[in-house]
Every structure is written in C-alpha cells, then in structure tokens.
C-alpha cells in the first residue's frame, strides 16, 4: 500500500470540501490513530492485520487532507510505551515500519509530484539499526520537498521530547553557546523534535479514548482537541469534516488564546531583560541614573547579544542532529 493514495474526491465530497474551504482551514492536523487492535478483534483478524489496515487508512487520510488544502499532518505511529507490549506485537510493528519505509523509497516519483517532505520525530536511537537506516534514507530523500509535510512520531513520547529539549539547552550552556539567562519557553520550543513545524491547529484521537497519551503535550496547548468514537481503520472523510467544522466553530477563541499567550511570553521576556539591565546599572553604580536613553541602549544591546547567542546555538544544534543522517549516508555509500 502506497504512502499517498492517488484519486479525486467524489462529487458530494468535493461539494462539502468547498463549503469547508469557505471558512478557516487548519494548516496542521495531528492524529492519534487509535483503535487498530480493537478493529482487528472486531473483524476477527490478527492484530498485525489491524495495524496494516491502520496504515492504509493513513494513506487515504493524507489524500483527503491534500484535497482540503491541509498541508501538514503529524501522526502518532509508535510510542516509546509501545515497547512494553508483547514481543510478537512489537516485532510486528517494527517489521511493518521496515516494509513501509522501504516502500517509500520506491515512491520517489509520487512524493516528488506532491512535494511531500517526510520527517520522523522521536528518539530513533531506540530502534534497531536497520530501521534507523531506512528512516534516515527516507528523511534524506524527501528533505528538499516543501509543498506538504508528513511528520511521523516514532519511538516518541512528549515527556521524552521535552526532557531531550532541556538536555539540549543544558548542552548549549555547557558548551558556552548560551548563557543560563537565555533559557526560555521560546528557546525550548525551538529545541523540540517538531521545531520546524507550526503547532497543530487540531489534534484528533479516534476510538473514543479521551486522553492524549503523552503526544504533543507542549504543542497542543492552544489546539482544538477532537475525540471521535470511530476506530482508526474505519475513519472516513466525513469524520475528518466533522473535526474541521468543530475547529471552525472554535477558531476565534483559539486564535485569541494563542495571540494572548504570544503577547504574555513577549512581556515576560521584556521584564527579564529590564531586570537584567537594572542589575547591570546597579553593579556600575548607576542605580540613580534616570537616563532613559541609556536604559534603552542597554536593553537593545542585551537582546541583540542574546539573539546572536541563540541563533548560534540553534545552528550548532541543527548541525549536531544532521550529523546522524550524514553518518547513515556515509555508511550506505
């Protein structure tokens, strides 16, 4: 089964899609594709067949998203917690991943046609070496495509992602690339696996479970959360439309909350900068200075220096992460 299913919407689906596109269309949707095992039990087939049908549904859902103008999709494919399942099920899931990432390498023409960039987010060092290699090749093969993006969260949990981002910032301080005062929510956001993506507009979980299961906890603080009872392999175009309509009904409130949060984050950073400038002036014996121009000059210099350090650190971090892909490329050459 292909990663991208070709084909047009039906006449009725196109009619409804045009109505939906008259309102605010989400740029980025995240899916917790839950219900594969229950689907297998319901249909009296092997669990592995349930997971295979789940992948097939992903390919179909990506086609719907493309037709609706949704250009970024993130899916929860394999949690670190999944390693605790039975050996046979874990082995089956990893074998399915091997098969699908190998298949992806055979679909270069289709991926290029649609401009699909594949990103795999997670602690990939937890995976078998041969699967790491297949994933690295898939990322490398599509990294220059930029029409639409598929983020596959594999060997992932949000807590692990956040802890890793904190370790990266600590590494930056240890290396002298950052000052401890440079550490902030904004910088942590840029150290996440998902740092190249906007936060999801909608998070959809199927199967009726009403929990996030350690998925994108940081990124979905201002997302529309949609919990649907349908099992993932039975997901339909109409289920997707229902979720988008729910997002559209709440779009104004969500956007207002995002804007307020962004302003609050800027305000807190300005307060920290002003406190740092005051401390500098006190150390220099200028605490009584009422020179507003001096304070503005110091404030501008402080923020400029911080931005230079942060950008230097982020470039070093990007290079460090890219080295993993480069090593696999060298190994296979």
Curated annotation (Swiss-Prot):
Mg(2+) binds at residue 34. Pathway: Protein modification; protein glycosylation; Lipid metabolism. It is an enzyme of class 2 (transferase). It comes from the Eukaryota. GO terms for molecular function: ditrans,polycis-polyprenyl diphosphate synthase [(2E,6E)-farnesyl diphosphate specific] activity; metal ion binding. Pfam families: Prenyltransf (PF01255). It is a peripheral membrane protein. (2E,6E)-farnesyl diphosphate binds at residues 34-35, 37-38, 85. GO terms for biological process: dolichol biosynthetic process; dolichyl diphosphate biosynthetic process. Its cofactor is Mg(2+). Keywords: Endoplasmic reticulum, Lipid metabolism, Magnesium, Membrane, Metal-binding, Transferase. Binds 1 magnesium ion per subunit. Isopentenyl diphosphate binds at residues 38, 85, 205, 211, 213. The catalytic site at NUS1-DHDDS interface accomodates both the allylic and the homoallylic IPP substrates to the S1 and S2 pockets respectively. The beta-phosphate groups of IPP substrates form hydrogen bonds with the RXG motif of NUS1 and four conserved residues of DHDDS (Arg-85, Arg-205, Arg-211 and Ser-213), while the allylic isopentenyl group is pointed toward the hydrophobic tunnel of the S1 pocket where the product elongation occurs. NCBIfam families: uppS. With NUS1, forms the dehydrodolichyl diphosphate synthase (DDS) complex, an essential component of the dolichol monophosphate (Dol-P) biosynthetic machinery. Both subunits contribute to enzymatic activity, i.e. condensation of multiple copies of isopentenyl pyrophosphate (IPP) to farnesyl pyrophosphate (FPP) to produce dehydrodolichyl diphosphate (Dedol-PP), a precursor of dolichol phosphate which is utilized as a sugar carrier in protein glycosylation in the endoplasmic reticulum (ER). Synthesizes long-chain polyprenols, mostly of C95 and C100 chain length. HAMAP family: ISPT. Belongs to the UPP synthase family. This is Dehydrodolichyl diphosphate synthase complex subunit Dhdds. It comes from Mus musculus. The gene is Dhdds.
């Amino acid at each position: 089964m292909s990663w991208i299913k070709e084909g047009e919407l039906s006449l009725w689906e196109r009619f409804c899609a045009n109505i939906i596109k008259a309102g605010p269309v989400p740029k980025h949707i995240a899916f917790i594709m839950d219900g594969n095992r229950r689907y297998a039990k319901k249909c009296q087939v092997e669990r592995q067949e349930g997971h295979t049908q789940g992948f097939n549904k992903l390919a179909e859902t990506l086609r719907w998203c493309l037709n609706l103008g949704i250009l970024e999709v993130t899916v929860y494919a394999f949690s670190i917690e999944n390693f605790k399942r039975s050996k046979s099920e874990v082995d089956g899931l990893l074998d399915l991943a091997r098969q699908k990432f190998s298949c992806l390498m055979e679909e270069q023409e289709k991926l290029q046609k649609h401009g699909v960039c594949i990103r795999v987010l997670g602690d990939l060092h937890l995976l078998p070496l041969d699967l790491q290699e297949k994933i690295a090749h898939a990322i490398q093969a599509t990294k220059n495509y930029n029409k639409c993006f598929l983020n596959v969260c594999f060997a992932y949990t949000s807590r692990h992602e956040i802890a890793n981002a904190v370790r990266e910032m600590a590494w930056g301080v240890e290396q002298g690339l950052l000052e401890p005062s440079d550490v902030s929510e904004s910088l942590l956001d840029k150290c996440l696996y998902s740092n190249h993506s906007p936060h999801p507009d909608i998070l959809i979980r199927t199967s009726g479970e009403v929990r996030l299961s350690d998925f994108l906890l940081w990124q979905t603080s201002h997302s529309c959360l949609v919990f649907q009872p349908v099992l993932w392999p039975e997901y339909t175009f109409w289920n997707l439309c229902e979720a988008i309509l729910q997002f559209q009904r709440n779009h104004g409130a969500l956007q207002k909350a995002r804007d307020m949060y962004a302003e609050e984050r800027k305000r807190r950073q300005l307060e920290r900068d002003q406190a740092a400038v005051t401390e500098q002036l006190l150390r220099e014996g200028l605490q009584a200075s009422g020179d507003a121009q001096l304070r503005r000059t110091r404030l501008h210099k402080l923020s400029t220096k911080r931005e230079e350090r942060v950008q230097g650190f982020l470039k070093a971090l990007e290079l460090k992460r890219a080295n993993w892909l480069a090593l696999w490329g060298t190994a296979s050459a």
